[in-house]
Amino acid sequence: MEDKNKEKINVVELFGSNVFNDKIMQERLPKKVYKELHKTIDEGKELDPITAEVVAGAMKDWAVEKGATHYTHWFQPLTGFTAEKHDAFITAPHADGTVSMDFSGKELIKGEPDASSFPSGGLRATFEARGYTAWDCTSPAFVREDSAGAILCIPTAFCSYTGEALDQKTPLLRSMQALQTQTLRLIRLFGNTTSRKVTPSVGVEQEYFIVDRQKYLKRKDLIFTGRTLFGAMPPKGQELDDHYFGVIRQRIAGFMKEVNEELWKLGVSAKTQHNEVAPAQHELAPIYAECNVAADHNQIIMETLKQVAERHGLQCLLHEKPFAGVNGSGKHNNWSITTDDGINLLDPGKTPHENVQFLMILTCILRAVDRHADLLRESAADVGNDHRLGANEAPPAIISVFLGEQLEDVLEQLISTGSATHSLKGGKLHTGVKTLPDFAKDATDRNRTSPFAFTGNKFEFRMVGSRDSVAECNVVITTIVAEAFSDACDRLEKAEDFELAVHDLIKEYATEHQRIVFNGNGYSEEWVEEAKRRGLPNINSMVEAIPALVTDKAIQLFGKFGVFTEAELRSRAEIQYEGYSKALNIEARAMIDIASKHIIPAVMRFSRNLAGTVNEIKTAGADVTVPMNMLKDTTALLSQTKLALAKLQEAADQAAAMENGREQAEYYHEVVFKDMEELRVPVDKLEMIVDKEEWPMPSYGDLLFEV
């Protein structure tokens, strides 16, 4: 029965209601100040102190009207999470004991968090504490409401006292500048004189798991590490394919409804929601936005999912592989290039063989991905992602590009004859049912096994881990494409005959880099062998991927476009090695703790009770074969568990004693992780034997199917 008192949501009014967006700025800022601020946002003009002061006052008044008592410089350090420090708007008490609410231009533009307390990879020592946050006016400020009240959040970049980037946003903004410069160079050669601004546009599909919070709190492995370290598969997993796009459960639907409302208030255009492949797995996707805004929005999405879940008695799991035996989670990064006058430069049009500018851009991107496949793979490297990539549930660890039949055919024409004369058409889809409409098919199918796939008017990078910031992969994509555009412009700007030169260059790039194009099954063993024959790198783990950051090629690339200095790259490599080691150390210690304090005692109690049962049956003169065999199996597995536990303890101690860096990370990867897997095997077998009432934590079945 419909609840007539249920509040109806006006999405149009709700959307952006907690965002200091362009509409609010037009209403609250003097025209001159509004224009000056937009010169900074649109053209990169330096913001003068007087303008900043007026903007700060208007922003404070708006936020206070929304109930805000504090503000924070909201930034993204290299921890993988966002960071914030809350400062109240109140001034020092006046002579009469009262206070005012104040917020200055200086407070808007600059903050000073402790840089030594965040990962810096050696860029900052403990005694070198000063760091700065700087307002990113291209990403709107917003008011976040939670149990602490309302807080004005100001998106900022974070750098050290000496100017090195200590965050995800700074290099992303640098890479966007580089792409704009080189793209404008390129499209000017094709006669475009109207576009003044170019930005990468990004839409991020976010996968996640939802479980009951009370059950989650009984799983110390989930609490400590974000994933289950032990767990036998339930009778049913995802093999029936009945969860994907299935009817959303009422409890989950209520959670999703509140998530949408919270995101809409914050200006995040949450568009799509559905069940994913694995039980208890779901996806949320917003409409695309400018790259740096999309990266901020994805952080807001992850925070909102976690906060709203708790309010519903649920727990959101963002780990890439919270459960063995079913699909893990990732995020798809949909990337395109758009101009301020509405042109999508990755739109091939209806006749791509005639769209020379598009073909130049396309072959430049092929060149970029082929030359820097190692960097692209590294941008998705994560300790949790190691469980997914190449495991027939996510793209393979081998970077390749899917173009589809239409564009592959155009490139083959270019390579074989030097020109393309036609484009394949999609035709009509006929269902054979008169009451169903016939409609035009796309010119090509989709390939879910490809890590970097062209999907009509954008590229979809599918390797990113579900917890990770999308800033890192977009820094790489944007910079390597900027380099390819720059190289092309260097050639074309010198050409005496532009038309001839551009056709020759398209053919050259298509020919040189055709090895990166693969439209087949990325999950197959045949592709692994074929990729090896083509000379494509197959980087299977995070530890193997990190060195790509500090090759001469990478240092030259990022240095040329001002995205990273060599010192910044080396610091990020060190941070990643250290982060990998710390994550594995926590997982190993958690396994040791859970096995020692919970699982082994529970199995011993079960064995003692089983032994008593054997004796009672024997006394009664009945057959003890079944309970005796159970007891033998249990004690044998318990012995294996104890041996594996001791082995893991020794390896974890040895790893922890090593100096931080590559060697330690490699030891964790090659020794400690394998010992963890070895311990899990007998424990998961014991779970299938021991009485459920005796087992010390909820099972996979409890977590995945009781939501």
Enumerate the language-model features and the residues they cover.
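Catalytic pocket of metal/acid-base enzymes, prominently hydrolases
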Residues: 2-34, 48, 130-135, 140-154, ...
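Active-site core of metal-dependent hydrolases
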Residues: 14-129
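Active-site proximal loops enriched in glycine and acidic residues that flank catalytic Cys/His/Asp
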Residues: 51, 75, 104, 286, ...
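Hydrophobic/aromatic-rich, well-ordered segments within soluble, folded domains that form packed cores
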Residues: 68, 72-74, 297-311, 337, ...
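Short linear, low-complexity motifs centered on an aromatic residue
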Residues: 80-96, 113-116, 121, 219, ...
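Glycine-rich, acidic/polar active-site loops that bind/position phosphate-bearing ligands
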Residues: 129-318, 327-330, 337-574
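Composition- and surface-driven signal marking solvent-exposed, interaction-prone regions
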Residues: 222-223, 298, 320-321, 347-351, ...
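C-terminal amphipathic alpha-helical interaction region
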Residues: 506, 511-707
